[in-house]
Design a protein with these regions (language model features):
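Short, compositionally biased low-complexity segments
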Residues: 3, 35-44
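Beta-strand elements of well-folded, non-transmembrane domains
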Residues: 108-114
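Short solvent-exposed beta->alpha transition segments
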Residues: 27, 43-101
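Second-shell loop/turn segments in exported
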Residues: 20, 31-32, 48-55, 142
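Short, low-complexity N-terminal intrinsically disordered segments enriched in polar/charged residues
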Residues: 18-35, 39
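Low-complexity, intrinsically disordered terminal/linker segments enriched in charged
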Residues: 119-206
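Bacterial Sec-dependent N-terminal signal peptides
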Residues: 1-24
Length: 206
């Protein structure tokens, strides 16, 4: 009986150490992911993104999209504020039959500057309403600068399709593509985990 207990203890400690190593990897990757966005390193961002997304949209199309979003255009420009990396939280690592997955939450703040327009109060309220519907906490710094804060989450996936390396997808419940990439069990868990996380954030804020 004692021998069986020791065997179980060794197996359990091995599992916990492996899980801890995966969690550390996901934490490190999420920190790097935020750095890459800050530096506008689009190749680096794409290298960390789940290959199904890259196959769907093509690398050059994705780079063009990132440039349009993060480098702005004649209408607006977007700046990402330095993220608080100490606020990144990584979940336990879960498993389906073929896929390992986990979640990493982090705060992100963006500053949007409207280049050719000053928004009056009614337009500001309309913009804020749209951003709030997307889970943002928006406030206007002045009549052409909007600051938006959000608690974001990425889904980390590891299976044969990722070359058994951790790859990442931004969690957005309205993004239908996630349904074709993320296993059903993992998607349900992501929805539950994110909702619980947001509820805890609200409780801590009160």
């Amino acid at each position: 009986m004692k021998k069986l207990f020791l065997t179980f203890l060794v197996l359990l400690s091995g599992f916990l150490l492996a899980q801890s190593a995966d969690q550390k990897k996901i934490l490190s990757d999420t920190q790097s992911f935020l750095d890459l966005f800050q530096k506008k390193d689009y190749e680096g961002i794409i290298n960390m993104t789940h290959p199904a997304v890259v196959e769907k949209f093509d690398k050059q199309t994705m780079i063009a999209g990132f440039k349009n979003l993060l480098e702005g255009n004649e209408a607006y420009k977007i700046q990402l504020k330095n993220a608080d990396k100490s606020a990144i939280n990584v979940s336990d690592v879960f498993k389906t039959k073929e896929t390992e997955y986990a979640f990493a939450t982090y705060p992100i703040t963006m500053i949007v500057t409207f280049m050719n327009e000053k928004l009056d109060e009614s337009k500001q309220e309309a913009v804020k309403s749209v951003m709030q519907s997307k889970g943002m906490n928006p406030k206007f710094v002045n009549d052409n600068t909007l600051e938006m804060a959000k608690q974001s989450m990425v889904i980390a996936l590891k299976d044969k399709s990722t070359g058994n390396e951790w790859k990442y997808l931004n969690y957005d419940e309205s993004n239908m593509m996630l349904l074709f990439v993320v296993p059903v069990d993992a998607m349900a868990k992501a929805k539950e985990y994110y909702a619980n996380f947001l509820n805890k954030q609200k409780e801590n804020a009160n």
